[in-house]
A protein has these predicted regions:
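Bacterial N-terminal signal peptides
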Residues: 10-20
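Alpha/propeptide regions of enzymes that mature by internal proteolysis
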Residues: 26-193, 200, 222-255, 268
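Short coil turns that delineate tetratricopeptide repeat
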Residues: 271, 305-306
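TPR alpha-solenoid repeat register
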Residues: 276, 310-311
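Canonical tetratricopeptide repeat
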Residues: 279, 313-314
Length: 338
């Protein structure tokens, strides 16, 4: 007997005939996790960046649906999701197989293809999508120049066309355009069950062989009443941290004026972020601009006293001058001095 908390299993029972195991194949107890959702895979023609973004009424959609590899492509695998489409699709595209042919091969080999929904885009911007005939309605996809949008278990069939139009008309970088697409899908009705999690991943158009440097953005909202809005907040915060990173890079190049501009931009984006204020101050102190740094140290100390305690520990790591007179002036801006 199905318990009330197991009612989500009911749709899976309809697909029991698909689960017969062929000789030599391992058993798959269900045709995949029921990650019914809407998503987009896309490429930025200006930068070559490739990405995927998704929202679902399913906990922690990020590890399941969106996949991307720099210089290779991106995949969204959903409906009764077979996660293998992600890594296997990327592996084929990495060997030079175009997205349409890669998807064709994987779909042909999948006995449960009728309940799958998958989209792929390769580094050249070629796209392909598959919506199985037994995906829960409303289900469908739309492809265009450098993108594919796909959705299933939607309120109605207007969701994915709305996503497509939004992506095509949106301004901004790839993250912004994909967010606009998700927002349009939700505004058009979205998942009939509601919403729970979201994710976005973007990689560079050319791989360096160092994946940790090639992943531009990977953000996830695991469980939230408005996951797209929360994802947008995280993207905004990511942009602020990128300003901080740019400031640090400018400091390394001894371009203090550029660093100040970047640090100031980050602080303006997220007022009250003591982390930004403190490291801005520390960078100025390192470059001999202590008079400018002291008010910033004071702000950081008032916001979070832990920064005051951290100051004496930093000279040994080269993050503040190893000069007792300078440290005394910095600490004088703290709560103990007040």
């Amino acid at each position: 007997m199905i318990r009330p908390d197991q009612r989500w299993l009911l749709p899976l029972l309809a697909f029991a005939p698909l689960l017969a195991v062929s000789p030599g194949r391992s058993a798959e107890p269900i045709p995949g996790r029921p990650v019914h959702t809407f998503s987009i895979v896309a490429r930025d023609p200006a930068t070559g960046a490739i990405g995927a973004a998704v929202q679902s009424h399913w906990f922690s959609v990020g590890p399941l649906v969106p996949w991307a590899e720099a210089g290779v492509g991106a995949v969204a695998t959903q409906s009764f999701v077979r996660v293998d489409y992600g890594p296997e699709g990327l592996a084929l595209m990495k060997k030079g197989v175009g997205a349409p042919e890669a998807l064709r091969r994987l779909v042909a080999a999948d006995e449960a293809r009728d309940v799958r929904q998958v989209a792929m885009i390769d580094a050249r911007g070629r796209v392909a999508a598959h919506t199985g005939g037994r995906c829960i309605r409303a289900a469908g996809h739309e492809t265009g120049a450098g993108y594919s949008v796909q959705a299933n278990l939607m309120v109605d069939a207007g969701v994915w066309p709305a996503m497509a139009r939004a992506f095509e008309t949106a301004q901004g970088d790839l993250a912004e355009r994909m967010l606009r697409s998700l927002e349009a899908g939700q505004a058009a009705g979205g998942d009939i069950r509601g919403r729970q999690s979201a994710a976005i991943v973007i990689v560079k158009g050319k791989g360096s062989g160092r994946p940790w440097n090639d992943r531009i953005m990977e953000l996830r909202v695991e469980d939230h009443p408005d996951p797209i809005a929360e994802l947008r907040r995280l993207v905004f915060l990511w942009r602020a941290y990128e300003e901080m990173n740019a400031g640090d890079l400018a400091i390394e190049k001894n371009d203090v004026e550029a660093a100040v501009r970047h640090y100031g931009a980050a602080e303006a984006m997220v007022p009250g972020m003591d982390e930004f204020v403190f490291w801005h101050a520390a960078a100025l102190a390192q470059k001999g601009r202590l008079d400018e740094a002291l008010p910033l140290f004071g702000r950081a100390f008032r916001q979070q006293p832990g920064w005051y305690l951290l100051v004496p520990r930093l000279p040994a790591s080269g993050l503040l001058p190893d000069d007792p007179a300078i440290l005394k002036r910095i600490l004088a801006a703290g709560p103990a001095a007040e």
